[in-house]
A protein has these predicted regions:
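Non-catalytic, mobile gating and regulatory segments of ester bond hydrolases
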Residues: 1-117, 121-222
Length: 222
């Protein structure tokens, strides 16, 4: 992946952790969304023909509870819906926050490209959001870059990305334990192209320390 592009997505993911966001002079609209009911935070930035969405990662006990709900849920409105299943905790949080309803209001006939990013739990939300938008707005160009993201859906979900969202990249810090969850034993699969950074300090040793966005930034800029 191009380093400049990687840094672009990393910077916006980093900014999603700020509670106050400074508007851009070049954007038509910049909004920091904090849904207190679901404890989901994300940045929504709108340009004339482009939209950028950046989701914050795990930031509270509520987020952790969503992460631990390993059961999968069938998604009825997507192609091959009988086969596609998504992590129930992530999907419930996404739908309850009405993220799609918020984004669809800023999509216009001029919208040609949507960029979506996120870290950790926010990366999982970014993937669900991308799949939802790509299904409903197939003529728009999408680019998705996520950092330290857990497995979010099953094999059919991964195949959906291969077909409809081929420009999806997953950045994985070697040693990041969250990227190993939920286990494949539960039927979960990663999506998109995988780019691994860093190195193992001890073979097959994973930790939460390697999961922080600061660790990702350090390894990328090193």
């Amino acid at each position: 992946m191009n380093f400049g592009k990687l840094l672009h997505f990393l910077n916006y993911t980093d900014r999603s952790y700020y509670d106050v966001y400074i508007p851009s002079k070049t954007a038509i609209k910049t909004e920091y969304v904090n849904n207190k009911k679901t404890d989901i935070q994300y940045i929504l930035r709108v340009y004339e023909n482009r939209i950028l969405i950046a989701f914050r990662g795990t930031d509270s006990c509520r987020d952790m509870m969503s992460n631990l709900q390993f059961f999968k849920k069938t998604v009825c409105h997507m192609p091959d819906s009988k086969k596609i299943r998504i992590h129930s905790g992530f999907y419930k949080a996404y739908t309850e926050a009405k993220i799609f309803d918020k984004i669809v209001k800023v999509i216009t006939d001029k919208t040609k490209r949507i960029e979506i990013t996120g870290h950790s739990y926010g990366g999982a939300l970014a993937l669900i959001c991308a799949a939802d938008l790509a299904h409903r707005f197939p003529d728009i160009e999408y680019e998705v870059v996520v950092f330290g993201t857990p497995r979010t859906g099953n094999k059919a979900f991964a195949e959906f990305f291969d077909k409809y969202l081929p420009n999806t990249s997953r950045i994985e810090n070697r040693g990041d334990i969250i990227t190993k969850l939920p286990p494949p034993l539960f039927g979960y699969r990663h999506v998109g192209k995988t780019y691994r950074i860093g190195s193992y300090h001890i073979p097959f040793f994973y930790s939460f320390k390697e999961h922080s966005l600061c660790s990702y930034r350090h390894k990328i800029l090193k």
